[in-house]
Amino acid sequence: MIFPDKFDVIVIGGGHAGTEACLAAARMGCKTLLLSHNIETLGQMSCNPAIGGIGKSHLVKEIDALGGAMAKATDKGGIQFRVLNNRKGPAVRATRAQADRVLYKAAVREILENQPNLTIFQQAADDLVVEGETVRGVVTQMGVTFLAPTVVLTAGTFLGGRIHIGLENHSGGRAGDPPSIALADRLRELPLRVDRLKTGTPPRIDARSVNFDGLDEQWGDKPTPVMSFLGSQDDHPRQTCCWVTHTNERTHDIIRSGFDRSPMFTGVIEGVGPRYCPSIEDKVNRFADKNSHQIFIEPEGLTTHELYPNGISTSLPFDIQLALVRSIKGFENAHIVRPGYAIEYDFFNPQDLQYSLETKVISGLFFAGQINGTTGYEEAGAQGLLAGANAALKAQGKEPWCPERDQAYMGVLVDDLITMGTREPYRMFTSRAEYRLLLREDNADLRLTEKGRELGLVDDIRWAAFCEKREQIEQETQRMRSTWVQANSAEALQLADKLTAPLNREYSLLDLLKRPELTYADLGHLKGEAVANVQVAEQVEITAKYAGYIDRQQDEIARLRQHENTPIPASFDYDSVEGLSNELKQKLNEARPDNIARASRIPGITPAAISLLVIYLKKRGMLRKVAAES
């Protein structure tokens, strides 16, 4: 049957990408349908019970700045919060939260069920309605057809999913959930490049069987950080600790003894696993000189005894899993509640996508999350929000939007995927962003919330809070710029113990704040009243201390803008450019960059090759032609 109600946007999959996608489209006023094979697993944390970390928290904060759910759900479900790299510069600082799986999922479910314009329906999607080169809707497992001009596919590891434990394997989307076989087969009929990837998860341990004596405790930070710009410590449930233990030589011997029954080493698994989150057998094999690997013992929640031993993801046979676990300090009598496993699944070459995350070959069809070759909740959520927003824009007849690399980590993520593609699960790091001093997690709202408001992603409450914060930053910066401290004054004497050298002239508070030995806490109350909002104080201090570096990066961006504004026609014939090697022509033909800057970021494309492209465009008058058409 054809469902009587028509929708603007249909989202398939209720994981981290799917929830952000449907919420974004609904916030923008589109009539949105979320299809999930099981409503009880909306927002499920399929692997580790944590949100954030290096590079990842930047994405979470950006999702939050655009009105998304991930940071809010983390504050509601977070049972331990820490700021990583706290002693380093603000560009690489990252908030990480240990989460209670049940509380996190409940928070996501509450947000979904209270979102206007959003309908949820429990059914697996088996087919797409495609007419010519345009998507028209979705057909569910029981034959119900839902119609919409745009569809966002966020299938996670479910497309052709296959679970491996030792040499035994079976179909599955994750442990306990069926795969999407019919939909995977349908997608393979489309003119899209498909391949296989692999990820894995460790065995879960019953805390009652663990000896914690002698294990290092790891508590969260005080005061407790918050993830959302609108969050507070009052949102947090009871906080708890994690523990640290290590593998040993005996553990490694046990692991090696199972190599002949490992699906990784016997060729049973064809998919490539994540480089930066390898299985324990992969670590033992690749780093044979190491006699120990660290394991973080993470609680799965406040109302369960399950522990997540972060660092021993494995697909080894269960007898090897049990032996290796019990060889580890603290786990001598450990009971495994759930065995570890690897899962192999389909992903599609992200170079077949536009920057809106719409497929190039099927109009109206968007991909987000692991289907694009990424790994991680945060990477999925960021793509989901962008895909959902762009699906809404397309349904509304508006131009698509994707932030640039100098505007957001989201922009870095999408640009990396589309420009370079990936042959292994892609994970975000701060090192991937060349403008990371501008793209800090602390200023994500200042970078993106105004654009989010323009798109319709940001509600009145968030907008009012943002405007007030921005105004306070401007006012406090101006106050400190116009407030002066004279040499030998009472204020100068108060600072004497902290200064590396006495003041020899008059300084503004803002100039003093630029000194590495002084903080806003030292200066804010010196003459006048300091601001109470810690986010405001943080922005005033960071902007002052790093002003020179920030200006330098902005100058570099301005120079590169000349290339950003040099478009390449969609029909451009790279084979006709004399001087380009066949290898470079092939790379450019595969990536089809839409401007010179994106062409320059393709691996192997040299500055000399870029010069040839610019000269060719100028000689043929294509720069003027493209500019006139735009």
Curated annotation (Swiss-Prot):
Binding sites annotated in the UniProt record for FAD? 13-18
The record's subcellular location field reads: Cytoplasm
- Entries under Pfam families matching the protein: GIDA, GIDA_C_1st, SAM_GIDA_C
The record, for Gene3D superfamilies, names: FAD/NAD(P)-binding domain, GidA associated domain, C-terminal subdomain, tRNA uridine 5-carboxymethylaminomethyl modification enzyme MnmG/GidA
Tell me where on the tree of life, at the top rank, the source sits. Bacteria
Question: Where along the sequence do coiled-coil regions lie?
Answer: none
Q: Which GO terms describe its molecular function?
A: flavin adenine dinucleotide binding
Could you say which cofactors this protein requires? FAD
Q: Which GO terms describe its biological process?
A: tRNA methylation; tRNA wobble uridine modification
Entry keywords, A to Z: Cytoplasm, FAD, Flavoprotein, NAD, tRNA processing
Keyword match tRNA processing: yes
Tagged with keyword Signal:
no
One Gene Ontology term, aspect cellular component: cytosol
Ligand binding (NAD(+)) = 273-287
Question: What is this protein's function per UniProt?
Answer: NAD-binding protein involved in the addition of a carboxymethylaminomethyl (cmnm) group at the wobble position (U34) of certain tRNAs, forming tRNA-cmnm(5)s(2)U34.
Family named by the database record: Belongs to the MnmG family.
- Cite the HAMAP family for this sequence: MnmG_GidA
Q: How does it assemble?
A: Homodimer. Heterotetramer of two MnmE and two MnmG subunits.
This one is known as: tRNA uridine 5-carboxymethylaminomethyl modification enzyme MnmG
